[in-house]
């Protein structure tokens, strides 16, 4: 979804992810071994947010709120959906603009939203419990605290839309299994994405912005 805004995805060649092995910057073990490296990596990712803006795809998702009750469930950690105007966003993998306690990362009491002038987190910056501030990111090997909330929304969905995902990162990729069988499912992606057999899916093989233009015409008549 955010690739069209200039944010490199985890699997795309190029960008920040090519500089470091995932094990070094996106696991609890990597953080324990070298907190400075991980802190610098996420500082750099936050700075990238200042240079990008929501694309037309983000804006069209937000505009659907004029016609539907829209809940966005995203694996992206940027804030582009919110900046585009979406009002109900579930971040499965955390949020780049927030930091939290190293000891109790999911304790709401210690989760802090950073203003742009605070994006440069330093070793020595403390959470309310005295621990080092760490990125509010769900790293590989950690549980996904918002997954049950996401499942609940999927079970109640009237329309289900999938945009720009390879459907191979779990548990998010399994959310489609919770969508009732009668609910129409739309998939927007320029590449071919494997879908579980037996599920009828309306595929729009385009990028996020172009695909959302087409979907909006289909849904809003």
Please place each PLM-identified region on the residue numbering:
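Conserved catalytic core of sirtuin-type NAD+-dependent deacylases
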Residues: 1-221
């Amino acid at each position: 979804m955010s690739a069209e805004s200039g944010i490199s995805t985890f699997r795309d060649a190029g960008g920040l992810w090519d500089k470091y092995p995932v094990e070094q910057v996106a696991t609890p073990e990597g953080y324990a071994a070298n907190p400075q490296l991980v802190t610098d990596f996420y500082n750099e990712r936050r700075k990238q947010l200042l240079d990008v803006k929501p694309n037309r795809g983000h804006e069209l998702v937000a505009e659907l709120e004029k016609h539907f009750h829209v809940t966005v469930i995203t694996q992206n950690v940027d804030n582009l959906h919110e900046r585009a105007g979406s009002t109900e966003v579930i971040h499965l993998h955390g949020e780049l603009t927030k930091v939290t306690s190293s000891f109790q990362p999911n304790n709401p009491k210690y989760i802090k939203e950073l203003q742009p002038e605070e994006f440069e987190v330093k070793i020595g910056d403390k959470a309310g419990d005295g621990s080092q501030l760490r990125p509010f990111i769900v790293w590989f090997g950690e549980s996904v605290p918002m997954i049950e909330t996401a499942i609940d929304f999927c079970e109640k969905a009237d329309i289900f839309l999938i945009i720009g995902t390879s459907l191979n990162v779990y548990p998010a990729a399994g959310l489609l299994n919770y969508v009732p069988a009668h609910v129409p499912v739309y998939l927007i992606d320029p590449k071919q994405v494997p879908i579980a057999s037996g599920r009828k899916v309306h595929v729009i093989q385009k990028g996020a912005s172009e695909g959302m233009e087409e979907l909006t015409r289909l849904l809003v008549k």
